[in-house]
Amino acid sequence: MFRTHTCGELRISDVNKQVKLSGWVQRSRKMGGMTFVDLRDRYGITQLVFNEEIDAELCERANKLGREFVIQIVGTVNERFSKNSHIPTGDIEIIVSELNILNSAITPPFTIEDNTDGGDDIRMKYRYLDLRRSAVRSNLELRHKMTIEVRSYLDKLGFLEVETPVLIGSTPEGARDFVVPSRMNPGQFYALPQSPQTLKQLLMVSGFDRYFQIAKCFRDEDLRADRQPEFTQIDCEMSFVEQEDVITTFEGMAKHLFKVIRNIELTGPFPRMPWSEAMRLYGSDKPDIRFGMQFVELMDILKGHGFSVFDNATYIGGICAEGAAGYTRKQLDALTEFVKKPQIGAKGMVYARIEADGTVKSSVDKFYIQEVLQQLKEAFGAKPGDLILILSGDDAMKTRKQLCELRLEMGNQLGLRDKNTFACLWVVDFPLFEWSEEEGRLMAMHHPFTSPKPEDIHLLDTNPAAVRANAYDMVINGVEVGGGSIRIHDSQLQNKMFELLGFTPERAQEQFGFLMNAFKFGAPPHGGLAYGLDRWVSLFAGLDSIRDCIAFPKNNSGRDVMLDAPAALDPSQLEELNLIVDIKE
């Protein structure tokens, strides 16, 4: 037996017990004739004491222990003289009588501490060391607890967990697929699933009326803080349901997770916001409603006064930051540079301060008399001490998105985005289609299987861009944690959808014939939702990136620097797969 207890288990009630512990050396220090060693395992840290007056040879061996040595000790639990209130085992220590070195270790490239000195790249390269840190390990423990709660919750509601294939056919709609060559079928490829979408719909046709899966998904897309090339979905589907049924079920799951994971009781239904309102007031389909600063359109007030930037704009909008009139010129210049960054793309920013006497002082005073500036103040309901920030542009949607970035930045600067405050909502009534300039055609805003609102079906022939989707996203603190829709279950309507998306009947049959044929055998009305497990864990753990809630993530370039993947294949493997690599310049 390597241990009788873990390193986080022993308490003052265990004094005088003889115990056996195993773990890693966190640190050691010598004080007079005593050597103190902090022994760490997954469960915590226990202080070990070696006394040269009791056993000089044992103490000498302890002095040679290095960081991350794997050791086993036998000793007696003793009440600690200098207690440590920061750790659960801080009232006790172990007087060691026996030491076994199970494995030595070279000096790690960074300190295995919560406040490590390791940068992101080195931590990713030695991820197995990074995972020894409690700050990272606790995220995976949280993830484990969440998956247990999800399974328990859905099981009680009669959902069945069904695994779907990971090697499937490629579909060009949506993000790019990761593809896998088939050795047995030369020149042909599998794709890794972006989601189990069509497969779970087939399960509904099969009569599995309540399905779920903790599903690994893959998308070959540009990465950012809340994206990884492989990620995990809590994937769910239900038969004989309408939108209200799905929302009720999964809002209930969200409330359950908040209660058991964060001990937060969410009462009342989550607010719902149409997509058009979210874009108009927040410039985003995932608005952070922890704070105000809703957009106000200012075209009627500010256009036509000789300021060419506004006079030539097709959209002028602003936000009001309460109590921020004290911003210095340097701070305002920094905000201007922020919105002018290439990834945001604004050409500049106008500001207006509400002075203590109620007058308005702006950066464009020479174009606007005080009467007009007072109208500006009234449009926001602004008070003395407030700061109004304004953007304009020739594309309303782009300008709103720029204003969204400015709003979030102001929320950060003013401390309005507390990670321990949670604001949940459903965004509903999305457009069914969006126009792609790159493709020169309509694209499905969600996916081709999303049902239109029944009351909008008549518009499919005359004004498809006006058709709303029977779709819904759950947004928490400005993060889309899940989304879904009621699906099309009628083969004629599905064919119409493919036609509007530019599919020929032959192409639709080639790519989705298996689903269309299944519908002919009686498909029930069905719908579902997928939660992003990584995003939920990140949200509850207060992380800025989903990377630290994934055991072995990729970096921002999509590389696994620990495994050095992706990598070139051996020529013999390429030959076996009938592949030739031809890298374009």
UniProtKB/Swiss-Prot annotation:
List ligand-binding residues for L-aspartate: E173, R219, H446, R487
Spell out the GO cellular component terms annotated for this protein, sorted alphabetically and separated by semicolons: cytoplasm
EC number(s) from the headed UniProt entry: 6.1.1.12
Which residues does the annotated region (Aspartate) include? 197-200
> Which keywords does this chain's UniProt record carry?
Aminoacyl-tRNA synthetase, ATP-binding, Cytoplasm, Ligase, Nucleotide-binding, Protein biosynthesis
Q: Which residues bind ATP?
A: R219, D220, E221, Q228, E480, G532, L533, D534, R535
Q: Which SUPFAM superfamilies does the protein's record reference?
A: Class II aaRS and biotin synthetases (SSF55681), GAD domain-like (SSF55261), Nucleic acid-binding proteins (SSF50249)
NADP recorded as keyword: no
Q: Which Pfam families match?
A: GAD (PF02938), tRNA-synt_2 (PF00152), tRNA_anti-codon (PF01336)
PANTHER family attached here? ASPARTATE--TRNA LIGASE, MITOCHONDRIAL (PTHR22594:SF5), ASPARTYL/LYSYL-TRNA SYNTHETASE (PTHR22594)
Q: Matching HAMAP family, A to Z?
A: Asp_tRNA_synth_type1 (MF_00044)
What is annotated about its quaternary structure and interactions?
A: Homodimer.
Q: What is this protein called?
A: Aspartate--tRNA ligase
